[in-house]
Amino acid sequence: MGLHTLLLLLLLRISASAAASRPPLDTLGIPPQDEAYFRGGVIRCRDGSGRFARDKLNDDFCDCPDGTDEPGTSACPEGKFYCQNAGHSPITIFSSRVNDGICDCCDGSDEYDSNVTCKNTCWEAGKAARDKLKKKVATYKSGVVIRNQEIQKAKVAFAKDEAELAKLKGEEKILQGLVDKLTEQKKLIEKAEEEERLRKEKEEKRMKEEAEKQAADEKKASDASQEVDSQENHETVQEDESKVAEHHDGHATSHDNHTPESESSVEQHDPESQDDISIKAAPADESPPEETSAAPTKEQESTPADSEGLSREELGRLVASRWTGEKVDEVSKDDKNEHEAEHDMPEHSEETHEDESDVPESAEDSYAGYHSEVEDDRHKYDDEDFSHESDDEYVDDHDEHVASYKSDDDQKGDDHSDFTASGQASWLDKIQQTVQNVLRTFNFFKTPVDLSEASRVRKEYDDASSKLSKIQSRISTLTDKLKHDFGKEKEFYYFYDQCFESKEGKYVYKVCPFKKASQVEGHSTTSLGRWDKFEESYRVMQFSNGDRCWNGPDRSLKVRLRCGLNNELNGVDEPSRCEYVAVLSTPALCDEQKLKELEQKLEASSNQRDHDEL
């Protein structure tokens, strides 16, 4: 009897406990924040499709298509059931899982009318969740401190980069002006050098043409001289033969006494002695017109002896000199000797007149006055006053230019000493001063161009252009950097120059925020995309337009950010073909607002536990 009574009391207590843990039927499955919506006598379906009376709430019959009237039963497939899970985290499940024989809620409230008895495990699960929540709160607290420090650094760095960019733009403007001036001067130098080059080419061409023309004239004169000499030799031979014949007829009785003279005459007219004949004829035309009538004969007599050792080539040059006006030292000496011999041998005057009459008039006319014209041309530029005057002008101009250049260098040295003394002059001021000195020094109207000064202008142009190029490159880098969105408080600013890596199997994944993401296998690199944007309020980084998959889309990567004390990339996966995901822990996500929410959640969980224990 006593045992029976104890069992009955135990069953009644268990039933009472189960009834106490189960909420009332009319509020079953309704979230606490929605209870006010169901307090009226007539309740409207949330989708606006109809209305229902309060007594039809959770009557296991679906009146609203969206399941508004059946949150605690499985009558409506679109209904939602709220698990309170006291001591742990509440969750929401589909109403179709209510009373299906599977315990979905840790407090067992979803199986209130089934054959399954669900054990309440919320305390055990809640304790583990609270411990995890406590760790998360601690991480957030430390992360918030790090984040605030990084934000302060980022703001200072951002302001510094903005100031540098503004300064560089100002320097670029000044330096661009200097480069433009130097470019203009450089073009003038190149133009002057080109004009000088063309002038030299033209002068060289003219001199070459004159040389060719002179050579042609000399050849023509040589050919004509040879032709005249040949004609004169022919006439001389005929005259000599005629005289020999007359002389032979007049002295036929004295043949034996004149045999040596005849042999000598024959030898003189032998074909092998034609060179001697041409030598004899040449000096007759070479003597000046002002000489006495006896001079040609003396020259004819002396020429064979003086020119006996000359070759045909030398004789040709001797004859050609009469055409070109050039003097031959040996011929001049022979002429002098002939003039001296002329006064010592007057007895040959008659013979001289006879030989002079034999010279063709055409030859004398063709050479008459030519020597005097050549001499006039030869002494046309022998004006000593003109030579000295031009030399003085050049020296004065050169000295004046050198003095000007030296004064600029001295002033440059003085300026440099001033900069050293003050210590306040920047590199840009020095460049400006140097360029001004160069532009003042260089004389663009001087011909030919001063190579040292031109080289100096080019050097300053190269230096200024190189500096300008570096400044423009830095401006481009800063402009590209500062155009990005670094978060509400610039919390992601220090991400710009960083890359994060994670090894997953045989691959190494590399993520560089604001730039690119890649997958590396050995020496092969596959692009997972270039920087696109932030998503979900700076909680996701999106990389798009990577390498195309074979017969598929372009690769892409989404990096989900979460609070962490260090920047660590992990959890890289490919849930869909060529669509990658990863997780990046960073202090940048440890914001104070989220920390407050977690602290409130932890406090609420602790208060609920204390209340339930009571």
Curated annotation (Swiss-Prot):
Carbohydrate attachment residues: 115
Keyword line: Disulfide bond, Endoplasmic reticulum, Glycoprotein, Plant defense, Signal
PROSITE patterns per UniProt: ER_TARGET, MRH
Signal peptide range: 1-20
Keyword Disulfide bond: yes
The organism's place on the tree of life at top rank: Eukaryota
Cellular compartment(s): Endoplasmic reticulum
Compositionally biased spans, kind Acidic residues: 352-364, 383-396
A Pfam family hit: PRKCSH_1
A Gene Ontology BP annotation from the UniProt entry: N-glycan processing
Chain intervals with Basic and acidic residues compositional bias: 194-222, 231-272, 324-351, 372-382
SS bond list: 499-512, 549-578, 563-590
Cellular component GO terms, alphabetical: glucosidase II complex
Region (Disordered): 194-396
Broad class of the protein's primary localization: endoplasmic reticulum
Sequence ranges assigned to domain MRH in this UniProt record: 497-592
Known pathway: Glycan metabolism; N-glycan metabolism
Subunit and interaction comment: Heterodimer of a catalytic alpha subunit and a beta subunit.
Function per UniProt: Regulatory subunit of glucosidase II. May be required for defense response elicited by pathogen-associated molecular patterns (PAMPs).
Protein name, entry field: Glucosidase 2 subunit beta
